[in-house]
Regions:
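Acyl-donor-binding surface of acyltransferase catalytic domains
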Residues: 1-12, 118-207, 344-349
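Short amphipathic alpha-helix that is part of the acyltransferase structural core
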Residues: 2-68, 75, 190-237
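Conserved donor-binding loop and adjoining core beta-sheet/short helix segment
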Residues: 17-21, 39-153, 260, 264-288
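Polar/charged side chains located within well-ordered beta-strands of beta-rich proteins
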Residues: 34-38, 42, 58, 146, ...
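Glycine-rich phosphate-binding loop
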Residues: 123, 295-299
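A conserved short alpha-helix in the GNAT/GCN5 acetyltransferase fold that borders
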Residues: 129-138, 292, 301-309
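Active-site/acyl-donor-binding loops of N-acyltransferases
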Residues: 164-185, 306-353
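A mid-sequence, solvent-exposed acidic-amphipathic segment
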Residues: 236-267
Length: 353
């Protein structure tokens, strides 16, 4: 899919203003084009639509909250102003940069996803990277992480990887995107001393909130998003905000806990977009440090899959991501029947001056 195309036209980059919509009504052509570009790549890599993101999910990623600031940059062949809502201005978009700036921790970091419209062109990458560095400079950010999905053999064959290396980026975490036919999921056998607890959204039952906050902090410590991620304190206010934010979307969250006498021993969750209910996206899976070595990583996934099948009869497949260096979890996924589809890569650039 990715063939480098040389452009002879100048590229113009502008901020989509504002980068979010207060409601989901009438998203602009720029917002829709960015979403279509993201999905086109994932469809090509996976051979289907199960890893795609609905427009509603796209809008949710652009909304600000207390944990992050979001910016969307549009690269086009024509110069002009672009809005997020009620704007059909066509500037001949060639690519977009979705930027996220953490506000509570890692405040020297910026995260970016570059989406290319139709063919990938080095000039578009160069323009988006320059604009990204400008946004970082304004916020005194010095480390950039770019997330990019590639084919299973893409590290050797994808020209975008070569371009990132040439720009000084270093390869970081590589995750494997996998998929499971839910019909193949086996029912769990839960041993004595453990009981499953289920909840929707972000708010667990009151008696488990303290334990839930601790296991989220522990997951951040043990499975950091980047190689230099700082510990993050989770609070009740944070999950209340996330719960309210999720309630505004068409997305539902299914959560499964395994609870013992000391609290939460294992946790996993999955998101279900009702615009595309056939594919369910499994998110975090985490086992408390005190409960490891008992097979709970596999068990909590089976517990979650049963909950998904019970609550969402239209669900047919599970999709998920796991780091390639997490051999234990990859082995669990293989036993469960998940099959690899593509890679999600993270690239790091430290900017001096």
């Amino acid at each position: 899919m990715w063939v480098s195309v040389v452009l002879i036209l100048s590229m113009f980059v502008s901020r989509v203003a504002p980068p979010h919509l207060e409601s989901n009504e009438q998203p602009s052509l720029a917002i829709r084009t960015n979403n279509e570009a993201f999905n086109a790549l994932n469809s090509y890599l996976s051979g289907g639509e199960d890893f795609n993101r609905s427009l509603d999910q796209e809008l949710a990623t652009l909304r600000p909250n207390s944990q992050r600031e979001n910016v969307l940059m549009a690269c086009a062949e024509r110069e002009g102003t672009v809005h997020a809502q009620k704007d059909e201005t066509d500037l001949k978009f060639r690519g977009f940069a979705q930027l996220s700036f953490p506000l509570l921790s890692d405040t020297h970091v910026a995260h970016a996803v570059f989406n290319y419209v139709d063919d990938f062109a080095p000039e578009v990458f160069d323009s988006l990277l320059t604009a990204t560095k400008d946004e970082m400079s304004q916020r005194q950010r010095t480390t950039l992480y770019v997330q990019m999905n590639i084919a299973l053999d893409g590290l050797e064959t994808d020209p975008r990887c070569e371009l990132l290396r040439g720009a000084g980026f270093e390869l970081g975490v590589v995750e494997q995107a996998s998929e499971l036919d839910l019909a193949l999921a086996q029912d769990p056998e839960i041993p004595a001393g453990l009981r499953p607890v289920y909840f929707a959204g972000w708010m667990p039952p009151e008696e488990h909130i303290k334990s839930f906050l601790r296991i989220m902090e522990m997951s951040w410590e043990d499975v950091p998003a980047t190689d230099e991620a700082e510990p993050q304190v989770w609070t009740r206010e944070m999950i209340e905000e996330l719960h309210a934010e999720n309630a505004r979307s068409t997305k539902d969250i299914a959560n499964a806990l395994l609870v013992d006498a000391e609290g939460i021993a294992a946790y996993s969750c999955a998101t279900i977009d009702h615009d595309h209910p056939e594919a369910v996206s499994q998110q975090i899976t985490f086992v408390h440090r005190r409960a490891r070595g008992q097979g709970l990583g596999m068990l909590i996934k089976q517990v979650l899959y049963r909950e998904v099948k019970d609550r969402f009869p239209d669900a047919r497949r599970i999709v998920t991501f796991n780091a390639l260096d997490n051999e234990r979890m990859l082995a669990i996924n293989e036993k469960l029947g998940l099959r690899p589809k593509f890679r999600e890569t993270s690239w790091k650039l430290v900017i001096n001056g």
